Structures are given as structure tokens and as C-alpha cells.
Amino acid sequence: MKKIILTVFAATSLLLYSTPSFALLSVSVGMPMGATVPAKDSDGDPVWDVDETSGYFIGVQLPFAVGLGVDSHKIGLKNTPTRKLATDIYNIFYQLPIPVVNLILGLGTGKQTVECPTCAEGTMVSEVYNGETYSYNGGFKPGSVTQWYTSIGIPILPLFDIHLSYRSITSKNIVAGGDTKMDYSSTVTGIGLAFNF
């Protein structure tokens, strides 16, 4: 019986020491590395080709393994170089108590807007086509988004880890031209560091 108790105590001590999921406080910062906007037109071709991504991810994990975070990033689009897809999301996440790696699952909600010189809601755009001038509402009304994400971190030293993340964002209610709902759902991958105190 003493051997069993000693073995359980030793194993528990090693597990608690080897993972920072039991840290009092953890702060993580990250940035997007790549993104896709998989919307397709009626021919099955991609509507948006991603040019670049920028922004940040911040998360603070509380002592009871639940954390809060914020994502703010922009996705540049190749086929419309002046247009960017701007997303701001607030997250709640949970770190699974797994030894050796830090696995996080999270959910978030927020808003998404299309940014460009003629993208403000209510902007009228005029174009000449076959010698005739046409005017239309070229603005975009911001929409709400939801996301789920996961992050896997590998401890480098007891005080910090490096992690990779994958975010799946659902956005199907940005209104273009006054009445057309657009599908700007996307996926974003990122990299970051977490500091454990």
C-alpha cells in the first residue's frame, strides 16, 4: 500500500511540474501567419485570394484553467488590393490538463468589417460601362462573427512555451450594396509565446 501511495504521489508531482497548466497566471501573445477565405463563386473558383495577414492574438489564463482573450487581425485580398477584411473577436478558452503539451480549446464572438476607400456603409459608387454611368451602393455593413479555435503549445522552459494555433471563423452576414449578404468565413493560423507565472 505504501508503494502505491508513493508511486501515485511521485507521478502526480511529475505531472504537475511538467505542465504549466497549473500555473497561477499565464499570458500569451501571438500573431497570424496565414489565412484562407474559402468562399467560391458559382463556377467553383475562389472569390478571394489572400495576400497578407497582420494583427495579434492576446490571451490571459486564470488560475482555474479558464482564460479570456482577444483577437484583432486583418486579411489583405489580392484581387482587390485596397480591400482588407478586419476582424475583432473576444474569446473564452480552456486549457486541457495534459502533461508535456498545452492544448487549448476556445470559442469566440465579435465583428467583422470590410475596409477600403469605398467600403464605408452607405457609400455610393459610380462606374462607366459601355458609355453609360451607373451608380450603386458600394458600401459594406459590418457583420457578426463566431469562431472556434485550438492551440497546441510545447514548453521550452518551465516559464514559457511556444504554440501554434488554428482558428475557424464563420462570417455570413456582412451586407454588401445594401441587401446582399456575403460569406467571408475564413481560417487563420498563428504562432505565439505564452509566459507562465
Per-region residue spans from a language model:
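Sec-dependent N-terminal signal peptides
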Residues: I4-S13
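Short glycine/proline- and aromatic-enriched beta-strand/turn motifs that initiate or cap beta-hairpins
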Residues: S21-T80, P99, T109-V114, N196
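Outer-membrane beta-barrel "beta-signal"
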Residues: L24-S26, I154, Y184-F197
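Outer-membrane beta-barrel translocator domains and adjoining extracellular loop/strand segments
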Residues: V37-D49, H73-L85, V114-T133, G138-F140, ...
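Residues that define the transmembrane beta-barrel architecture of outer-membrane proteins
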Residues: P46-Y56, L62, K84-I92, P99, ...
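Membrane-embedded beta-strands that build the outer-membrane beta-barrel scaffold
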Residues: I58, L68-S72, I92-Y94, L105-L107, ...
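Secondary-structure transition into beta-strands, especially the periplasmic turns and strand N-termini
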Residues: V66, V101-L103, I156-F160
